[in-house]
Amino acid sequence: MDNKALAKKQLEDTLSTLKQLDDNVWIMQYKSNYGLDKLLDKGCGNIMDAVKFLQKEVNFPALNINPDHSGFACSTFNAKTPEGGFILGRNFDYKAAPCLVLWTTPENGYRSLSVVDTTFFIHGTKYVPLKNAKRPLRVMGAPYMSMDGINEKGLAFGVLEIKSKATKQQTGKKPIITTVAIRAVLDKCATVDEAIDLLASYDMHDSIFINYHYQVVDANGTSAIIEYVDNKMHVIRQEKEDDCLALTNYFLTPGGDNHDGRGYDRYEKIMTTLKDKDGTVTEDEAMDLLSKVTLHYRHPALKHMVITLWSSVYNCTEKSMLMCAGMDYGKKYKFTLDKPCEYTVL
């Protein structure tokens, strides 16, 4: 089979797995080569670099990018489970839209389970169903649209916004944008230290004109916060083994610009709850905590609804994810890394 025929088959195989579970959740197993090594070697300094690469590598369609970044928020935390495992809890807050649960199996990297915000490239500014005849090729860029995920080594990773000046490092290293960095960590890193080292090896260029920070947890229970203040990378680590860390939408690094003040209340709620439970919660208790720090409001300038699109509890020991989407906490989905496109409704 020649390369063109192989690419066509991989495209068809991928799209054949695309399935809608309800109004808030789609699932898909990516069965094509998305060329991460080539992109990292080339460098990716802005969104259009990524789009042009995808157009060449995976038949991604031409489109104009006008990202609406206002209202992106989120919350994360790490904790232990009663069974001795480790979790990353995560709320993703943004413009109301469905999410896509994605399984990837790269040729030169770790398998992963991640969640894609379909607003960025797949739907654009006007919602169109994923299987609309004009849109299916957009899902071929999904590996570079994941906002959080977990890989086969039990490393979980998530991104959150800070309303501050975007990072644009210029130290002579190859550039990397936010969503490509997320994909690189999931595909290449087994531990927190490896994730930190990988991010430090690139010049970070925040994707859409605003600052981002990250929380990472691994199967050993190690967790860290990674932030960029004035174009310098900072790492906040646990003071003691198994300590709980949390992150919302302001800098934890001393000297960071926190004029906005978003997320203080959510951070305090998370940390107080975890302290009261000695840092140990079940997956259901973690989900209950996430349900108490959701967002739901109409954006004052852009007039769209900002909600918690999904709440996920990544189990770094089991390599699984418990998810509620669209703020429907009466329906829980359980996904596992080893069983692509299979799920249980709890």
Tell what function each PLM region has.
Residues 183-186, 196-199, 271:
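Non-transmembrane alpha-helical segments in soluble domains
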Residues 191-194:
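Alpha-helix N-cap recognition
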Residues 1-189, 204, 281-346:
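N-terminal mature-domain region immediately after signal-peptide cleavage
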Residues 263-287:
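Long, charge-rich alpha-helical interaction segments
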Residues 251-255, 262:
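Mature, function-bearing regions of proteins
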Residues 197-207, 214:
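Secretory/export targeting leaders with adjacent low-complexity proregions
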Residues 159-163, 181, 199, 216-220, ...:
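Short, structured patches in soluble enzyme cores that scaffold and shape functional sites
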Residues 209-251:
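Extended amphipathic alpha-helical segments with heptad-repeat/coiled-coil character used for oligomerization
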